[in-house]
């Protein structure tokens, strides 16, 4: 797990403050694919599935990952907006960024609930519950990595 944490820290720290102004869509796509690949690997290594369970789980997981991926794209746009306005965030922009951040969090929870419910229809709670725990840990690592790479909002001088 330490290797995973270091991997995510490396990925997000590479999006340092100075580099964010020139976001490259290919670079962002590469980071997303790396994160998705590592996330899938972590889930596979930590979730003991029978063949029947795997045949039911992975298609739902892939749908979940695709739905969540759309939120990642929106989160990148919010981060870009934050960085581009970093030296001049007024009340309107600040409130808008906070509103967008809350919206993304609520939508992420809605997506997670939707796919957890789909999994519960075909898999035992022990499998779904463990996946839920793994998924939340991965999300926490990603969030910490992302937050560590962004500067805090400047205070008025």
Name each region found by the language model.
Residues 21, 28, 39-122:
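Amphipathic alpha-helical segments
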């Amino acid at each position: 797990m330490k290797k995973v944490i270091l991997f995510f820290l490396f990925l997000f720290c590479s999006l340092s403050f100075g580099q964010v102004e020139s976001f490259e869509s290919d670079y962002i796509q590469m980071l997303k694919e790396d994160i998705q690949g590592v996330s899938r690997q972590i889930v596979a290594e930590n979730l003991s599935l029978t063949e029947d369970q795997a045949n039911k789980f992975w298609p739902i997981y892939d749908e979940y990952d695709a739905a969540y991926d759309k939120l990642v794209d929106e989160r990148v746009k919010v981060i870009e907006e934050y960085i581009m306005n970093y030296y001049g965030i007024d009340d309107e922009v600040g409130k808008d960024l906070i509103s967008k951040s809350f919206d993304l969090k609520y939508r992420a929870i809605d997506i997670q609930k939707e796919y957890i419910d789909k999994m519960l229809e075909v898999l035992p709670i022990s499998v779904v519950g463990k996946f839920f725990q793994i998924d939340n840990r991965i999300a926490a690592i990603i969030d910490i990595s992302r937050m560590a790479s962004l500067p805090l909002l400047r205070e008025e001088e």
